[in-house]
């Protein structure tokens, strides 16, 4: 895998953001791993996280004009990514939304740069796709165009039907979804460590049942 992808998996494990064991998902499945982006919770981790996202965005070649971080998790993500991109020589405006509209001051639900041109949505993962749907609606209501979505991890896992949430977003909105890492990269990480054979087998079994 690309060097930054391998580094990101190791970074997530070291930060205890990515854990292996037995975890119950919202869908009631027993997953052999858990990804909790909320534990990227200090300055150094957030700085590195933004850099990994920025590398994935540049690597993808996706064209966009504005970065949008949906409340709440997307807000620090968007800020850290545009700072990282600025360090790479690209200055990108960013915006985020409030959960509730403000009726004083600048008002409205969108804070930061105007949503115009091609807008790239950032999130940690795509589960049900609710956050993406709300973001797409908000962007289109501003007469802007959704350019795509960038996430930290693609679990490559079926939802209620035969497709993953990521596949559904790609097809429903006809936009690319860029992931810093996918389940494939997690598997490669486990394969390199002889002490993680049990975890590797658990992931393989889970993937056989729920993978896409």
From Swiss-Prot:
Q: Which biological process, per GO, is one annotated for this protein?
A: 'de novo' UMP biosynthetic process
Q: Where is the signal peptide?
A: none
One Pfam family assigned to this protein is: Pribosyltran
Q: Which reaction does it catalyse?
A: orotidine 5'-phosphate + diphosphate = orotate + 5-phospho-alpha-D-ribose 1-diphosphate
Origin: domain of life: Bacteria
What is the required cofactor set for this protein? Mg(2+)
What keywords is this UniProt entry annotated with?
A: Glycosyltransferase, Magnesium, Pyrimidine biosynthesis, Transferase
Q: Which GO terms describe its cellular component?
A: cytoplasm
Any one Gene Ontology MF annotation carried by this entry is:
magnesium ion binding
The first-level EC class reads transferase
EC numbers listed for it are: 2.4.2.10
- CDD domains, per database record: PRTases_typeI
Q: Which Gene3D superfamilies match?
A: 3.40.50.2020
**Sequence positions that bind orotate:** 34-35, 127, 155
Its UniProt pathway annotation is:
Pyrimidine metabolism; UMP biosynthesis via de novo pathway; UMP from orotate: step 1/2
User: Which residues does 5-phospho-alpha-D-ribose 1-diphosphate bind?
Assistant: 26, 72-73, 98-99, 102, 104, 123-131
UniProt function note:
Catalyzes the transfer of a ribosyl phosphate group from 5-phosphoribose 1-diphosphate to orotate, leading to the formation of orotidine monophosphate (OMP).
User: What family is reported?
Assistant: Belongs to the purine/pyrimidine phosphoribosyltransferase family. PyrE subfamily.
Q: How does it assemble?
A: Homodimer.
Protein name as catalogued: Orotate phosphoribosyltransferase
